[in-house]
Amino acid sequence: MDFDLPPANDPRRLAVKQWLAGHPQPTATQLVDAGYVVPHWPEPWGLNADPLHQIIIDDELAKAGVSRPANQIGIGWAGPTLLTAGTEEQKQRYLRPLLTGREIWCQMFSEPDAGSDLANVATRAVRDGDEYVVNGSKIWTSGGHLSQFGILIARTNPEVPKHEGISYFICPTDLPGLTMTPIVDSTGSHLFNQVFFDDVRLPASLRVGVEGEGWRLAKVTLANERVRLSSAGSLWGNGPSAEDLLDAVRDSGGCSDPIMRQELAALKCEAEVLRLNRLRTLTAQLAGRTPGPEASVQKAMSDDHGQRV
């Protein structure tokens, strides 16, 4: 396993540096136009970059203090699924606003009586001409109240084996009959929501893939949730890293509290573990292997680490 990234004079690294010199504070639109939001996506949204090229871009953006648009579910989950099974019209309509962060997305998978057991979803979508009539409820919808669209799975055929009767949809959050109820936690914070569908009419043109393909596409979505090549030590690829935190402590004169110093040292060690594990995943991909448990370890560890940072 090679833990060394290409040197400073690597042409790919120099190209990013040159672009950043001309765009020292790039807007989201400029980042999208350059292909730097999702370098591994195909053109015109990305650069068809291999994993190594993507990490080079990640490193150079991080060094320059540049953050990508914050739209985790849209960019990380909905986008790859649309690339996999969306129509050309769906890709042209939704991918660019999703990448710039102009349109925020949420996930509508879990249900009150099924939890994360997606095969047992009970929300129904009944075909009626050019529309589906949706009834049911979703829960733990993160950021739904801030989103313009959701990725929705619903049961379109209850007569077939449960894995075969689910379909996948793009769901605008402003449709008549769709309501969001806040779930307020013990601190008074509102991140999650319960979504209710009461005869919501969803155009059939918003179905992704063919009817009954929702189980397969949900697995595509969840696979992209688990494999993330975001910078080690940051939360969802955004916000400060452990190195940023240590730099801030140094710039402020250091830390004399021994307990806090131990915590900072632990964060630094964790960040290095995440960096090396990220490169292990990269090595597997470059060798043509499917990422294994290390991808799940990365997800579980990085979110907790990012919150602590």
Where are these predicted regions, by residue range?
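A short core secondary-structure module
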Residues: 130-131, 135-181
